[in-house]
Each structure stands twice: as C-alpha cells, then as structure tokens.
Amino acid sequence: GAAEYGNKLNLTFDEMDSVITQGKELGIYLYMFTGGEPLVRKEDIIKLCKKHSDCAFLAYTNGTLVDEKLCEQMVEVGNFYLAISLEGFEAVNDLRRGNGVYGKVMHAMELLKQYGLIFGTSICYTSKNIETVTSDEFVDLMVEKGCRYAFYFHYMPVGNDAAVELLPTPEQREEIFHRIRKFRQTKAIFSMDFQNDAQFVGGCIAGGRRYLHINAKGDVEPCVFIHYSNANIHDCSLLDALKSPLFQAYHDNQPFNDNMLRPCPMLENPDKLGEMVKESKAVNTDYQSPETPEHLKEKAAPYAENWTPTAEKLWNEEKEKIEAKKNA
C-alpha cells in the first residue's frame, strides 16, 4: 500500500488520483491517508473511493470530523475504513489531543457502529501510556464501542524535538509483546503491533517492499517515519520512485536483522539507516527542521542496545515455538 500525508494534506485530488492509477498498474490496491487530519479532505477521499472501487482505503483520523453524512457516504462506497487515534482514557488522551476530543471519539465510534461500518483504533504506545492502552479495561471498551481492529504503533524518536523519554523500556516492550499475543487469542478484536509482529511479514516492509509513503509535498519516502527521499511524484512516475537509490538500498538490505524483533533500520539497527542515506545521497524531507541521520542514530542507539538482549531471548523462544509446531 501507499500512504499520502501532510499537515495540510495538500496533494491535489488529481495528484492522488494519479498515484492510485499508477499504483494499480503495479498491483497496489490498498491506500492509506495519514495526517495532519485526512478527514478535512473527506469529499476528495470519497470521490477517490468511488472512482477506484476496486481499491481499499483507510484513514488514520482523530475522529472529530466523523458525522452522519460521512457515515452515509462510507456505507455507499463500501471501501473506506477508519483507524481512530487514541492515547488512552479521557485524561491522558485529551492531554495529547486536546480537550473534549475523547468525548468526540466515543461519539464517532457510536455513529460508525450504528451504521454497521468497519473501523478500529490506532494507538501510539509510549513509556507513559503503555500500561493503560494494553489494559483489559481499555481493550474491552474498544470492543464494546465496535472496533474490529487495534493498530499498536511503537513511539518513534523522529524529529529534532522528539522526546526520547517516551521510548518504552525493554521490560515494557516485552510486556506488550506478550499482551497483544494474548489479546489475539482472547479478545474479539484483531490486534496488531507494528514493531513486534514483524515475524509475520518477514521484517521491515518499507521502501517499496510492501509499502511506501508519499508526503504532502510529493516526496516518496520509504516509510512514514523515515524522512529521506530521492524522488518526488511531481517529477517522476511511481515506478521510477520505487527504483530510486534509497528504495534500492532498502531492497538490498532487507531484512535488516534476522531477529524479527529487531526489524527497523532506524530503531533497532540505527547504523543501517545512516549507511543507506549516505550511499543513496537521499535528502531530508522534513523542511521545517531537517534532522541528520547521525542525530537520529544518537537517540536510537541506546534504545537499540538496551532492547537487544530481551529481543534475542524472546526471538529464540519464538523460534523454538515455531520449530515445535513444525514437528508436532
């Protein structure tokens, strides 16, 4: 899938339409919108859903713009799904997302459920909220509200102003590894952990292996969290972007680690990203506050080092389980 994104979501309808048209020729039928807030462009998104009825579209949203009209349009098109961002219960959520947002999210979920629509939640877990968002109470509430899936994202220390203290500890990450696996067996919701479930997709899927990201300016990036690029959709085709030096470097280096609990070239293998950026001469795409790969590595390296022993232990246990199943 490809994703389009930006603070002002300022790719035009025609530009997004062109990306999808080109994508379909390459076999891409899943498109995601992130933000900013993609639902400020809901009319354009619905138009894209109608025009490309053979594709599935998903928006990551704060949920505040969900109303009856949108629900009716979603029922009509049948190929648009939502992942509503939550950080926890009301007090924690509104601290990050603004007063009153939690109440609006609950209302949005009630509306979507009433219309029989498929939706879920998107949760960024940090050292501060990890206990809450993996509690039975929280997950049970999501099930009750009608969520069919929960996408758990590990906090990424991207950007010059990133707060490294929000990175989960090895103990916390080990705990969420076990809890989400338990939820998949016991809760009526499909839970995915984007950092701890790499074993099911053979490691990092970015850089065009199974996924890429296009920002608001049209820069084609390997991943929503990796702000480096050699290609822009205004200057080249999607296929050319997939052949760009940084994407080729991803292709040549994946998987970045044989340990599937250390999949990322930034977070768990921080040397890798710098090497690929240097080798591909990719430029930084964060125009407001460009960050060097060296600065990013400084933040990720201590985390990677601390996580490695736990990752090795857990991955060895997983491999034993896989072997046991094979031999059963």
Show which residues each predicted segment covers.
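Radical SAM/AdoMet-radical enzyme domain recognition
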Residues: 13-34, 41-153
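Flexible mid-to-C-terminal extensions adjoining Fe-S/redox cofactors in radical SAM and related proteins
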Residues: 225-328
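Radical SAM enzyme [4Fe-4S]-AdoMet core and its adjacent flexible, acidic
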Residues: 55, 94-207, 216-217, 221, ...
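N-terminal pre-core extensions flanking Radical SAM catalytic domains
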Residues: 1-3, 24, 238
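Canonical Radical SAM [4Fe-4S] cluster-binding loop centered on the CxxxCxxC motif
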Residues: 1-13
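A short, flexible beta-alpha/helix-coil linker loop
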Residues: 2-5, 89-91, 157-160
